[in-house]
Amino acid sequence: MPSVRSVTCCCLLWMMLSVQLVTPGSPGTAQLSGQRTARSSGSTVCKMMCRLGYGHLYPSCGCRGKRDVVSSSMAV
């Protein structure tokens, strides 16, 4: 049975790849209709990545502060 951590990582990876495909203006990515939807879903994923401490993987998200490894809280 897969662990919660591995399932969470798979879900996050899938979401990151999905956002990469629908981000308007990115070179070599698909352009879907409804660009407002693409931006809002990207924003939601960025917020989640920042909260989980993975914002450093996506500099375009502009996360502020660094994740404190010991307490898992954001240090500004």
From Swiss-Prot:
Please list the tissues where expression of this protein has been recorded: Expressed by the venom duct.
Task: Kindly list the GO CC terms recorded for this protein.
Answer: extracellular region; host cell postsynaptic membrane
| Protein name per its UniProtKB record | Alpha/kappa-conotoxin-like fe14.2
Cysteines joined through disulfide linkages: 46-61, 50-63
Range of residues in the leader sequence:
1-24
Say if the entry is tagged with keyword Signal: yes
Q: Which family does it belong to?
A: Belongs to the conotoxin J superfamily.
Residues with the modification Arginine amide, per the entry, are: 64
Localization annotation: Secreted
Q: What does this protein do?
A: Highly inhibits both nicotinic acetylcholine receptors (neuronal (alpha-3/beta-4) and muscular (alpha-1/beta-1/epsilon/delta) subtypes) and the voltage-gated potassium channel Kv1.6/KCNA6 subtype.
Q: Upper taxonomic classification of the species?
A: Eukaryota, Metazoa, Spiralia, Lophotrochozoa, Mollusca
Provide the residue ranges of the propeptide in this protein: 25-39, 65-76
Comment text on domains: The cysteine framework is XIV (C-C-C-C).
Q: Could you give a GO molecular-function term held by this entry?
A: acetylcholine receptor inhibitor activity
* Alphabetically ordered keywords of this record: Acetylcholine receptor inhibiting toxin, Amidation, Disulfide bond, Ion channel impairing toxin, Neurotoxin, Postsynaptic neurotoxin, Potassium channel impairing toxin, Secreted, Signal, Toxin, Voltage-gated potassium channel impairing toxin
